UniProtKB/Swiss-Prot annotation:
Residues 319-358 are annotated as: Disordered. NCBIfam families: PRK12289.1, ribosome small subunit-dependent GTPase A. GO terms for molecular function: GTP binding; GTPase activity; metal ion binding; rRNA binding. This is Small ribosomal subunit biogenesis GTPase RsgA.
Length: 358
């Protein structure tokens, strides 16, 4: 390890916890991770620091493996749920079994991913629990939806060559329902990282959440993989008129011709080129009703969600709950900051990850 102080180093934020940031440097000291704080001037101008941010680090001390983030470079992309920057593609992970593939749930994840405008890849894990006929059927089915899936088995270590090629030299966000094997997938792609693995629970066939914070992992092919906290059902919070463009099947139909009306909802309007016999049309109609209901609810609140927050239950039912009033807190004392620093300065990145599992 180099015991020196350098200035103007650049790197990527790979983890955020409390008021500290793990930065993976991309300079001559490749592979070094520094535990950094954020400069006070960044706080004053309201500059947040997110996982995935490209940052400039000052006062790097490789003896203590510490530094200070002095600048956050412009972001190419930004996702708020989970909070991560500069993602280039989303890898949606599902399971062929345990839990079983649910077309409606897959559609929700696909629509949510499409709304980001990022490239989308689909991975189906646990193919060792199914039959070859199932794999073929789902391959054709997802292709009909506009996606080319990668079929893998973490248990049997199968199918990873093509998947790694897809992840090569990209920053990828991993997402999908809980219990499909995302943590096991990361363990297989990056053996030196030991992610907690949760079993699939009982009758509901839903996985237990094993990831609590967004983290970036370095892949052997120079890509970066962001593991997001598992969740069972993403929300549909787009505008009704935007939903059409989040289905590749609809985009393909509109590329061949236009509907008679510019504001066509593709339900009962005459001369509609979208309405018809395509598999996910019913999913589109259900999500459209959800988007319309959400928009109407927002219009009824004069403050546009300023005092209410939207909650979506597992059945897709929307409810609004009052937001907690904002509170003013005292500025953290210097002594408290020093105590936090002492607790973190001797920790490795793996130690911080292990804290999440407690």
């Amino acid at each position: 390890m180099v015991d020196a102080q350098l200035t103007d180093l650049y790197g990527t934020v790979v983890a955020v916890q409390a008021n500290f940031y793990q930065v993976r440097l991309d300079s001559a000291v490749m592979g070094e991770n520094l535990l950094c704080t954020r400069r006070a001037r960044l706080q004053k101008i309201g500059q947040s620091v997110m996982v995935g941010d490209r940052v400039r680090v000052e006062e790097a001390n490789f003896g203590d493996q510490q530094g200070a983030i002095a600048e956050v470079l412009p972001r190419s992309t930004e996702i708020d749920r989970p909070a991560v920057a500069n993602i280039e593609q989303i890898l949606l992970v599902f399971a062929l079994a345990e839990p079983v593939l649910d077309p409606w749930l897959i559609s929700r994840f696909l629509v949510k991913a499409e709304s980001t405008g990022l490239e989308i890849a689909v991975c189906v894990n646990k193919i060792d629990l199914g039959e070859p006929e199932q794999i073929e059927v789902w391959g054709d089915r997802l292709a009909g939806w506009g996606y080319r899936p990668f079929f893998v088995s973490v248990e049997k270590n199968r199918g990873f060559e093509a998947l790694l090629a897809q992840l090569n030299h990209k920053i990828t966000l991993l997402a999908g329902p809980s219990g499909v094997g995302k943590s096991s997938l990361i363990n297989c792609l990056i053996p030196e990282i030991n992610q907690r693995v949760g079993d699939v629970s009982g009758k509901l066939q839903k996985g237990r959440h094993t990831t609590r914070h967004v983290q970036l992992f370095a892949l052997p092919n120079r890509g970066l993989l962001a593991d997001s906290p598992g969740f069972n059902q993403p929300d549909i919070n787009c505008l009704p008129e935007e939903l059409t463009f989040y289905f590749p099947e609809v985009r393909a139909r509109l590329a061949l011709g236009n509907c008679q009306f510019n504001d066509c909802t593709h339900r009962r309007e005459p001369n509609c080129v979208v309405r018809g016999d395509w598999e996910r049309y019913q999913h589109y109609l259900e999500f459209l009703e959800e988007a319309i209901a959400r928009e109407q609810s927002l219009q009824k609140t004069s403050t546009k969600e300023s005092s209410l927050k939207l909650k979506i239950k597992e059945a897709g039912q929307e409810t609004y709950e009052p937001k907690l009033a904002n509170k003013k807190y005292r500025r953290p004392s210097r002594r408290g900051k020093n105590q936090d620093q002492e607790r973190y300065e001797n920790k490795t990145l793996q130690d911080i990850y292990n804290d999440d599992s407690e």
